[in-house]
Amino acid sequence: MEHYKLLITVGIFFLNTSLVFSQENVNTNERDFRITKGKYYSSLTFSLDSRIAKNEDQLIRQVVDQNRYDYRIIGNGGYAIKDNMTLGLLAGYGRAREEITFVDENGENVTSKRLQQGLSLAPNMRNYIPIGKGQLQVLVQTELNVTFGESLQRTFRMDDIEKVEGDFVDLKLGISPGMVLFFDKHWAFETTVGIAGLSMRIEEEITNDDRDNRQRVVESGVDFRINLLQLNLGVAYYF
């Protein structure tokens, strides 16, 4: 599937680039890569997930054609309150788009187009676990993520078009593990995966511009599986 290929390709690029930089730094023994009390950091990461499918059986429906992408840009900054521990705040923007045609239970072709975007804020705490001299470190980020967003979905049937507009708030409390690889005393590559933990979504929906009959939907869940498909890659500066 396309999104697996994309993530594998990006992951291989990240690892190969990291190895090149690490091989060029021959004097790493003289450098101090530790995250010590009083240090600051700032980072910029990016994630992309895309999927293209044709004539695929997705268990609950037969998909004729599907085209989806989802990306996020995240800026993060923080301060080390003690060795190997930081407190910070991240801000991000995400956008998702999907166009899918599938066969419903009546054998009718249905086309759905959905667009969603949102802004996120998340206070967070990071714990670093140095490996060896600390040029490579395991990162565990705990965060409370709040996303404010909007969505628009249009569903096209043979004799009907339905439009659903939504405003939502997403709350997520959980952990996001990752790795940090320093290629300089101050600069590092960072990669993290999707949050595992508690989530809640509150959304108000308006169907076909009928604002007098708006619906309020509340969803909550617990998921402690690490989402390896949501891979964030970026660069950080420590000073």
Predicted regions and their residues:
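Bacterial Sec-dependent N-terminal signal peptides
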Residues: 1-27, 235, 239
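Short glycine/proline- and aromatic-enriched beta-strand/turn motifs that initiate or cap beta-hairpins
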Residues: 22-87, 223, 228-239
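Transmembrane beta-barrel strands of outer-membrane/channel proteins
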Residues: 44-50, 89-95, 140-148, 179, ...
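Outer-membrane beta-barrel translocator domains and adjoining extracellular loop/strand segments
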Residues: 54-61, 99-108, 150-161, 202-210
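Gram-negative (and chloroplast) outer-membrane scaffold detector with strong preference
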Residues: 78-158, 166-170, 187, 226-239
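Predominantly the C-terminal beta-signal and adjacent terminal strand-loop region
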Residues: 178-239
